[in-house]
A protein has these predicted regions:
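Helix-turn-helix
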Residues: 17, 25-59, 63
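Amphipathic alpha-helical segments used for helix-helix packing
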Residues: 101-120, 165-171
């Protein structure tokens, strides 16, 4: 192994450590607790070392968000495939997996959709974002009818995001989660 190869490997390992530590800290104490100083202390490197990987907290959150989107896409894809090709069942499974993901990974969900990140959506989207949208599109588009399928998917995804955000914020009755999801699926599949 050449010294350059070793340095590249060590740099990649540090990069991974920064992201993993940010996720762990956010999940245990919230995103306000994630600072470059605290991350440097946790991983036992100086702040300049962290800044050699990321320009600041926003870039770290962006890296975490992109990973989260890839994870959410995998959850949603598994749900879609479990539905056996029946469109309504597929939509219901994807919708439930989305809400479950938001509940199971709150800090990750916040990084993905509620915090300031530098992720391009639309035509310039990264592959994880495209993959996530593709799963949503596969679930929602069969019900678009006369509407543009991509726009219909965006509206459906927005509705799920609203339910997830309000539910996680304690602004909806916890006992009615399944009923709300059933209403949404009924409305979208008319």
């Amino acid at each position: 192994m050449t010294p350059q190869t070793r340095r590249e490997r060590e740099r990649a390992e540090r990069h991974r450590l920064i992201i993993d530590t940010a996720r762990e800290l956010a999940e245990s104490q919230g995103w306000d607790a994630v600072t470059v100083r605290r991350l440097a202390e946790r991983i036992e490197y100086s702040q300049p070392v962290l800044y050699s990987h990321f320009a600041g907290k926003d870039e770290i959150v962006t890296a975490v968000a992109e990973e989260g989107i890839a994870e959410m896409a995998a959850w949603s894809r598994a749900a879609l495939e479990s539905a056996g090709g029946e469109p309504r069942a597929a939509l219901a499974a994807v919708a439930r997996s989305y809400l479950d993901f938001a509940t199971a990974r709150p800090a990750l969900y916040d990084a993905m959709f509620l915090m300031k990140v530098n992720l391009a959506f639309g035509e310039n989207a990264s592959q994880p974002l495209r993959d996530a949208f593709a799963v949503m599109f596969a679930a929602f588009s069969p019900f678009a009818g006369e509407h543009d399928p991509e726009t219909f998917t965006e509206v459906g995804w927005s509705a799920l995001h609203g339910l997830a955000t309000l539910d996680r914020g304690g602004r909806l009755r916890p006992t009615q989660r399944d009923a709300r999801l059933a209403v949404l699926i009924d409305q979208l599949t008319r």
